[in-house]
C-alpha cells in the first residue's frame, strides 16, 4: 500500500487516485531566464523517480510540468541582454532540456507554457472577478482579495493576521489588503502584453499555474509538487485561486522536496556557493549527481559538497563493480532466483513508504553484496541477482549504463594516459604475468596506480577504473 506524506495534512496518507489506475501530477517547472541550478536538479530528479515508480506499479501517469515563459525576471533579463523575450526563453528552454537529458530525467507527459494558455488564464481571472474574489485596481492591475478566501493559509499553516503582520510586503495603495496578490499586470510601454477585459497586460505568476494545471488535469487532481520555497506564497495562492474559481478541492496530495544547502549554508549567489547543473556536471559524471540526489529521502534537506559527491561516486562505483564482469550477459538472464523476489519486495516496501529512496538504495547495496558472494559460488545465481538489481535500479534511474562508462570515464585521459595507453600497459602486464615475471607485473600495477588507475583482476580478465 503506497503512502504519501501530504504537506497539507502534514502526515502520511494512503494514496487513493481519483480515477482507478490513473494518476495526474503537476509540478511547478522553471522560469526560463537562466540556467537550471542544483535546487532545480533536485526537484527534477525527485519527481522523475516518483513518476517512474508509479508507472512501475502499473499506473497510467499524466505528468505535467509547466514552463514559466513570461515573468518580471524574464522581461528584465531580455532587456538587459538586448534580446527578444522569445529568443531568451527559447535558449534557456533548450538548455533546461539538455540538463534533464544529462541527468536521465524523462520528459513529462506535457510541458505547457504560460504564453500558450493566456485565454485560460483570462477566463479564470474573470471567474474570480465574477465571484467577488478579485478586483480591478485603478492602475490597471487585477488583484486577488485574500480576505475573501476563508481557508487562506491552510497549506503553510499561517493565519492571515500573521501573514499581514509578519510579511515584508511593500505598501501598495492599489491593494485592499497588503497580502493581496496580482492576477493580471497592466502593461508598461514596450512590454510583452496581451489584450484582456482589463486592458493590455500579462498574467501574474500564481494564476499561470492554476490555469494550466486545471486545464491539463481537471479541477481536482491527485498530486501537486515543487520545491520547498514554493509552499508559500506560490502554492498557497494557487489553492486560493483554484478553489475559489472552481468550487472544488484543488489537489489531494501536496508534495514538497527538501532544501539544498551547499557546505551547510543556504545556496545563494551572494555567498558565492550557487551552482548550475552544468557547472556540477563539468566536475562529476551525471549519474553520480543523480545518485547523490536519489540517495536521500526527497523531503530531507541535503548538503552539497565535494566530499558528498565523492562519497556518491564511491557508492555508485561499488554498485557497478558488483555487476561489472556480469554486465554483458544480463540481457539473456531469466530471473528464477527466489532471493530476487525477496529483495524486490523490500524495495517496493521502501518506495511505498512515501517514496523512501534512501531505504531503496540500501536494498540495492544488499543485493550487490549478494551478487559478490554468488559470483564466487554460483554464476547463474549471481547473474539472476545482478539482473534483478539492475531492473530495480531503473526505477531510480540508476545502473542503466555500461559499467565501464562510469569506471573509466567517457574516453578522457587519466593521469595523462589515454585509454589506449592504459590498455597497452594492461597488455604488457598480462604478458609479464604469463611469463611469471611478477616483479614487472607489480611495477606496471604500481605505475598505473600512481597515475590514478586501479586494476581489478578476475577470472574474466583484468579491468580498470579511475582511482
Swiss-Prot record:
Catalytic activity: tRNA(Cys) + L-cysteine + ATP = L-cysteinyl-tRNA(Cys) + AMP + diphosphate
Enzyme Commission number(s) from the entry: 6.1.1.16
InterPro entries per the UniProt record, alphabetical: Cys-tRNA-ligase (IPR015803), Cys-tRNA-synt_Ia_DALR (IPR015273), Cys-tRNA/MSH_ligase (IPR024909), Rossmann-like_a/b/a_fold (IPR014729), tRNA-synt_1_cat_dom (IPR032678), tRNAsynth_Ia_anticodon-bd (IPR009080)
GO biological process, one term: cysteinyl-tRNA aminoacylation
Any one Gene Ontology cellular component term annotated for this protein: cytosol
Disulfide bridge positions per record: none
Principal subcellular localization: cytoplasm
Subcellular location: Cytoplasm
Record motif 'KMSKS' region, residues: 266-270
Keywords: Aminoacyl-tRNA synthetase, ATP-binding, Cytoplasm, Ligase, Metal-binding, Nucleotide-binding, Protein biosynthesis, Zinc
Sequence motif: 'HIGH' region, positions: 30-40
HAMAP family reported in the protein's UniProt record: Cys_tRNA_synth
Similarity-based family: Belongs to the class-I aminoacyl-tRNA synthetase family.
Subunit-structure text: Monomer.
Name the UniProt record assigns to this protein: Cysteine--tRNA ligase
Annotated source species: Hahella chejuensis (strain KCTC 2396)
Lineage of the organism: Bacteria, Pseudomonadati, Pseudomonadota, Gammaproteobacteria, Oceanospirillales
Record gene name: cysS
Amino acid at each position: 500500500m503506497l503512502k504519501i506524506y501530504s504537506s497539507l495534512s502534514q502526515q502520511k496518507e494512503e494514496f487513493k487516485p481519483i480515477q482507478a489506475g490513473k494518476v495526474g501530477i503537476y509540478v511547478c517547472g522553471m522560469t526560463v531566464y537562466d540556467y537550471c541550478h542544483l535546487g532545480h536538479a533536485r526537484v527534477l530528479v525527485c519527481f522523475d523517480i516518483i513518476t517512474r515508480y508509479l508507472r512501475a506499479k502499473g499506473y497510467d501517469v499524466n505528468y505535467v510540468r509547466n514552463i514559466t515563459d513570461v515573468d518580471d525576471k524574464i522581461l528584465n533579463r531580455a532587456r538587459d541582454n538586448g534580446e527578444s523575450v522569445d529568443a531568451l526563453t527559447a535558449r534557456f528552454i533548450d538548455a533546461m532540456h539538455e540538463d534533464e537529458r544529462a541527468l536521465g530525467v524523462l520528459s513529462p507527459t506535457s510541458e505547457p507554457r504560460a504564453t500558450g494558455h493566456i485565454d485560460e488564464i483570462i477566463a479564470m481571472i474573470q471567474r474570480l472577478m465574477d465571484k467577488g474574489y478579485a478586483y480591478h485596481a485603478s492602475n490597471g492591475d487585477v488583484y486577488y482579495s485574500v480576505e475573501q478566501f476563508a481557508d487562506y493559509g491552510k497549506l503553510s499553516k499561517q493565519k492571515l493576521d500573521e501573514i499581514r503582520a509578519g510579511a515584508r510586503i511593500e505598501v501598495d495603495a492599489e491593494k485592499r489588503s497588503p497580502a493581496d496578490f496580482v492576477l493580471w499586470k497592466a502593461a508598461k510601454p514596450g512590454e510583452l502584453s496581451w489584450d484582456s477585459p482589463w486592458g493590455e497586460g500579462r498574467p501574474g505568476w500564481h494564476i499561470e499555474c492554476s490555469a494550466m494545471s486545471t486545464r491539463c488535469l481537471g479541477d481536482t487532481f491527485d498530486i501537486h509538487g515543487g520545491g520547498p520555497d514554493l509552499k508559500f506564497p506560490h502554492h498557497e495562492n494557487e489553492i486560493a485561486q483554484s478553489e475559489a474559481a472552481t468550487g472544488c478541492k484543488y489537489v489531494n496530495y501536496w508534495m514538497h522536496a527538501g532544501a539544498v544547502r551547499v557546505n551547510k549554508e543556504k545556496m545563494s549567489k551572494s555567498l558565492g556557493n550557487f551552482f548550475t547543473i552544468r557547472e556540477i556536471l563539468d566536475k562529476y559524471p551525471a549519474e553520480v549527481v543523480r545518485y547523490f540526489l536519489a540517495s536521500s529521502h526527497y523531503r530531507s534537506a541535503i548538503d552539497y559538497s565535494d566530499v558528498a559527491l565523492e562519497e556518491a561516486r564511491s557508492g555508485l562505483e561499488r554498485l557497478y563493480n558488483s555487476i561489472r564482469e556480469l554486465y554483458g550477459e544480463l540481457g539473456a538472464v531469466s530471473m528464477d532466483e527466489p532471493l530476487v523476489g525477496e529483495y524486490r519486495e523490500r524495495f517496493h516496501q521502501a518506495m511505498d513508504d512515501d517514496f523512501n529512496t534512501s531505504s531503496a538504495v540500501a536494498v540495492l547495496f544488499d543485493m550487490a553484496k549478494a551478487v559478490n558472494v554468488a559470483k564466487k559460488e554460483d554464476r547463474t545465481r549471481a547473474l539472476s541477482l545482478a539482473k534483478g538489481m539492475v531492473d530495480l535500479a531503473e526505477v531510480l534511474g540508476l545502473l542503466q549504463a555500461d559499467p565501464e562508462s562510469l569506471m573509466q570515464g567517457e574516453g578522457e585521459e587519466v593521469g595523462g594516459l589515454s585509454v589506449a595507453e592504459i590498455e597497452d600497459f594492461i597488455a604488457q602486464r598480462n604478458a609479464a604475468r604469463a611469463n611469471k615475471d611478477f616483479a614487472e607485473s607489480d611495477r606496471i600495477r604500481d605505475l598505473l596506480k600512481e597515475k590514478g588507475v586501479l586494476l581489478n583482476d578476475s577470472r574474466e580478465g583484468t579491468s580498470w577504473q579511475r582511482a
